């Protein structure tokens, strides 16, 4: 899991909840965190991998996600984002909100934040 690019925690646990900070499609490169090349599809694939890594550190997994927020700089990428989303979540279908935004940190084209429930009381 890469370190946050700002003054915040990657996740916070409260009761059975794990709440992640927004994750963008960054990897740790030679010069620190950098966006993966390839546009929104590649960035979202990496952002969701980053979400999975944060959840794992918190003792959760993607199948524990109850709700998610997807931020997109270009809503024209919505259909492609849905395909990446389906690949990441498989048959699991958490609630989701998609929001169009004017910009995101580090020039990202997408960002994902999730809430997961981990104590089994669904």
How does the language model describe each region?
Residues 1-122:
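Short, polar/acidic, helix-capping and beta-turn segments at strand->helix junctions
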């Amino acid at each position: 899991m890469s370190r946050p690019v700002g003054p915040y925690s990657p996740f916070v646990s409260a009761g059975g909840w794990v709440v992640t900070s927004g994750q963008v499609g960054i990897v740790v490169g030679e010069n620190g965190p950098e966006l993966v090349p390839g546009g929104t599809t590649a960035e979202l694939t990496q952002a969701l991998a980053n979400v999975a890594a944060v959840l794992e550190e918190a003792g959760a997994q993607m199948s524990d996600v109850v709700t998610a927020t997807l931020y997109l700089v270009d809503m024209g990428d919505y259909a492609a984002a849905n395909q990446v989303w389906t690949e990441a979540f498989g048959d699991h279908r958490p609630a989701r909100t998609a929001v169009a935004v004017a910009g995101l940190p580090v020039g990202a084209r997408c960002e994902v934040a999730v809430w997961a429930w981990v104590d089994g009381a669904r």
